[in-house]
Design a protein with these regions (language model features):
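Interaction-mediating elements
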Residues: 1-122
Length: 122
């Protein structure tokens, strides 16, 4: 059930590889050990001119990738740390960005607050 939003900051002349969303979904699904069709990835592109860091300019190789994860329950402690490390590594490899440019955020647990097909996630 994980839903993962990947927001890729791209330069003006950057071309996104065909199939990038599927490659990300496959890699993220393997990271979460999800059965086929159970991890959903939504890929969003953010133009470089719509992203900034205060008092700083970035080289194209430094453009970030923002990742937001929604799961039934959020892991804790070492399990969360390990999952973030694996997820950042997988996304870095697929996008060609350094792992230091991949930033992962976990949303609050979906249990009890999200519905699929009219059914509350328990």
């Amino acid at each position: 059930m994980p839903i993962v939003d990947v927001e890729l900051v791209v330069g003006g002349s950057s071309v996104v590889a065909p199939g990038l969303a599927q490659s990300l979904a496959d890699a993220v699904g393997r990271t979460f050990q999800s059965p086929p069709g159970q991890t959903w990835v939504r890929l969003h592109l953010l133009g470089r001119d719509h992203y900034a860091e205060n008092e700083s300019s970035l080289e194209p190789t430094e453009l970030p990738v923002f990742v937001k994860v929604l799961k039934r329950a959020v892991p804790e402690g070492a399990k969360l740390a390990g999952e973030i490390t694996q997820l950042a590594g997988a996304i870095a490899e697929i996008t060609g960005r350094p792992v230091s440019c991949v930033h992962v955020e976990y949303a609050p647990a979906a249990r009890g607050r999200l519905g699929f097909g009219g059914q509350l996630v328990e």
